[in-house]
Amino acid sequence: MPRVKRGVTARARHKKVLKLAKGYYGARSRTYRVAVQAVTKAGQYAYRDRRQKKRQFRQLWIARINAAARQNGLSYSRFINGLKKASIEIDRKILADIAVFDKVVFATLVEKAKEALN
C-alpha cells in the first residue's frame, strides 16, 4: 500500500479550529493546541447555557409579573392562582410582556384574578 501523508487533513483540521477560535484573546486564537482547549471549553459552556437560558428567562418573567402584581396589590402566587381559578390561560412569557408594555391590561387581569379568588 502507498504511504499516506496527512498534511492536507491536519492543515484543514487546524484551520477549522483556528477559525472557530477567531476573536479569542492571545494564544487562544493563534496556537492550535491552546485553541483546541478553548474551543472545546466554549462548546461546553454553550451547551450548558442553552439549557440555563430557559430557566433564567422564566425567572425573569416571574420577577416581572411579581413586581407588577404587587403594584396592583396582589402577590405573584395569589395572582397566578386567581388566573387559574378564572380559567385565564396566559403563559408567563406573555404575562411578563403585558406587565411591562401594557399596564392597563395587566391591571384588568389582576382585577379578574381578585374576583376569582373571592
Swiss-Prot record:
Gene responsible for this protein: rplT
Keywords annotated in UniProt: Ribonucleoprotein, Ribosomal protein, RNA-binding, rRNA-binding
GO MF annotation list: rRNA binding; structural constituent of ribosome
Family listed: Belongs to the bacterial ribosomal protein bL20 family.
Cellular component GO terms held in the UniProt record: ribonucleoprotein complex; ribosome
Function: Binds directly to 23S ribosomal RNA and is necessary for the in vitro assembly process of the 50S ribosomal subunit. It is not involved in the protein synthesizing functions of that subunit.
GO biological process: ribosomal large subunit assembly; translation
The name this protein goes by in its record: Large ribosomal subunit protein bL20
InterPro entries, A to Z: Ribosomal_bL20, RIBOSOMAL_L20_CS, Ribosomal_protein_bL20_C
